[in-house]
């Protein structure tokens, strides 16, 4: 297997698909903005950062530390691979190391892949701290004995809104009283995912969580992060019914990105009808070229069936690629999913073909090439998916391949609609009566409702 540079892939694209390239956009590299360590940062944490090659913080990390330290609800908006995990890890652990009575922290992630990835990242950081708390992941894959251990002794727990709704809040008095009574921080990553009907339900789950925390004597600080949202301040205000400090001046450096917009050619059938070839006419040879030349690649498809079809087409007649080109989709067993994630991070897998299951901020290594088989549906998802590559500071390439649909055909011929358009706003309405009223019985089961309550005021449901 030869070693190929990302510049060679660009030459391959421009040579083999020259007549099909509708546009090329170049996002030039940007330098970062840095700040020194906070004066009150624990020396042990300073040593850990230095040991990991971190001599300074990005400006947004410094701001986040300052605001969280002042007990302010904080929203951090920055692009992928900008150190968001470190932004909340530092202030939380800085307080944890100095605290005489250990507190608990709840970390919420929208997908299992992201939860397991952050469990690994957070766990690695925690192992370097002498006064290390107990970390656990509470989701549908967690065995019964592990769940009991988490309930008894966890200081840091990773979970998701579904488990919060169905597993934690209904049992807050019997199983979670210890954890909730000392809950100090709630971290919500990828907060832009909580929008629409789903976000409205999640907002009411947070209403119930704050109510239960108040019953147990805790008043946690919310820390949120997002890479792509058009109305960050308004969104978190609607989601949590709290005022937030919004930090949106991203101080991380940006590597150079080349984005190609390709429209597969029109061909004539035997009946002389014109039709456009599918995205596979471009993605199959491109994936094969990348895999054979050691270019680490991710290809996004809209549906599971498309993932499987594309994978079969790539390895058809090229069975030597079967071990380094793999499909990733929903419906896999937990063991299969984690095995794929490990092999992807280690570099054993060179190309992963996936649905949007890997769209969010899971650290999947130093990828160089991103292929989008059709428009993902929103401008936010376009940038989220293309942001999977170039995370380690290296140049990267994104290839958008249009399908023969009205939306894709419009976008491939009007690329400024994507590259210059603002990110969509995330909207929700937690007071929608059809949603709000579904949470009233849940809240009443968790603790008797009273007319003077602020979270579930009687006026809202009369």
List where the protein language model places each region.
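Conserved strand-helix element at the start of the C-terminal RecA-like helicase core
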Residues: 104-118, 287-315
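Conserved segment of the helicase C-terminal RecA-like domain
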Residues: 380-429
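Conserved interdomain linker/interface between the two RecA-like ATPase lobes of SF2 helicase motors
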Residues: 233-304, 428
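Conserved helix/coil segment N-terminal to the catalytic DExD/H
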Residues: 140-182
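Helicase-associated low-complexity/disordered flanking segments
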Residues: 1-62, 72-73, 133
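Post-DEXD/H (motif II) to motif III coupling segment of the RecA-like Helicase ATP-binding lobe
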Residues: 175, 185, 192-252
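Conserved helicase ATPase core of P-loop NTP-dependent helicases/translocases
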Residues: 146, 332-355
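Conserved helix-turn-beta segment of the N-terminal RecA-like "Helicase ATP-binding" lobe
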Residues: 114-139, 238-244
């Amino acid at each position: 297997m030869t070693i190929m540079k990302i510049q060679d892939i660009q030459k391959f694209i421009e040579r083999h698909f020259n007549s099909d390239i509708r546009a090329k956009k170049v996002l030039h590299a940007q330098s970062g903005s840095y700040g020194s360590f906070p004066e009150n940062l624990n020396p042990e944490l300073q040593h850990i950062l230095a040991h990991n090659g971190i001599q300074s913080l990005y400006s947004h990390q410094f701001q986040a530390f300052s605001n969280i330290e002042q007990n302010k609800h904080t929203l951090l908006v920055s692009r992928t691979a900008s150190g968001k995990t470190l932004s909340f890890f530092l202030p939380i652990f800085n307080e944890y190391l100095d605290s005489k009575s250990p507190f608990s922290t709840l970390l919420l992630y929208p997908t299992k892949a992201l939860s397991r990835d952050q469990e690994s990242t957070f766990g690695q950081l925690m192992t370097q701290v002498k006064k290390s708390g107990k970390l656990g992941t509470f989701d549908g894959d967690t065995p019964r004995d592990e769940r009991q251990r988490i309930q008894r002794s966890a200081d840091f727990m990773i979970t998701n809104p579904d488990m919060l709704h169905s597993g934690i809040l209904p049992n807050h008095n019997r199983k979670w009283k210890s954890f909730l009574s000392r809950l100090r921080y709630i971290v919500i990553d990828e907060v832009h995912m909580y929008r629409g009907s789903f976000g409205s339900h999640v907002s009411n789950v947070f209403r119930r969580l704050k109510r239960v925390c108040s019953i147990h004597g805790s008043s946690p600080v919310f820390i949120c992060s997002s890479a792509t949202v058009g109305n960050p301040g308004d969104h978190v205000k609607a989601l949590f019914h709290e005022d937030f400090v919004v930090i949106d001046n991203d101080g991380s450096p940006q590597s150079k990105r080349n984005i190609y917009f390709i429209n597969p050619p029109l061909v004539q059938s035997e009946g002389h009808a014109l039709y456009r070839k599918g995205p596979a006419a471009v993605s199959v040879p491109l994936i094969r070229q990348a895999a054979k030349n050691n270019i680490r690649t991710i290809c996004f498809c809209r549906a599971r069936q498309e993932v499987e079809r594309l994978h079969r087409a790539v390895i058809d007649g090229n069975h030597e690629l079967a071990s380094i080109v793999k499909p990733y989709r929903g419906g896999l067993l937990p063991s299969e999913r984690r095995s794929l994630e490990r092999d992807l991070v280690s570099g054993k897998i060179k190309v992963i073909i996936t649905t949007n299951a890997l769209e969010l901020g899971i650290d999947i290594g130093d990828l160089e090439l991103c292929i989008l088989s059709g428009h993902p549906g929103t401008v936010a998802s376009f940038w989220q998916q293309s942001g999977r590559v170039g995370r380690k500071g290296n140049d990267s390439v994104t290839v958008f391949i249009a399908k023969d649909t009205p939306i894709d055909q419009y976008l491939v011929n009007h690329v400024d609609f994507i590259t210059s358009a603002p990110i969509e706003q995330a909207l929700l309405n937690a007071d929608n009566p059809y949603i709000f009223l579904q949470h009233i019985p849940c809240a009443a089961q968790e603790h008797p409702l009273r007319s003077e309550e602020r979270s579930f005021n009687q006026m809202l449901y009369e």
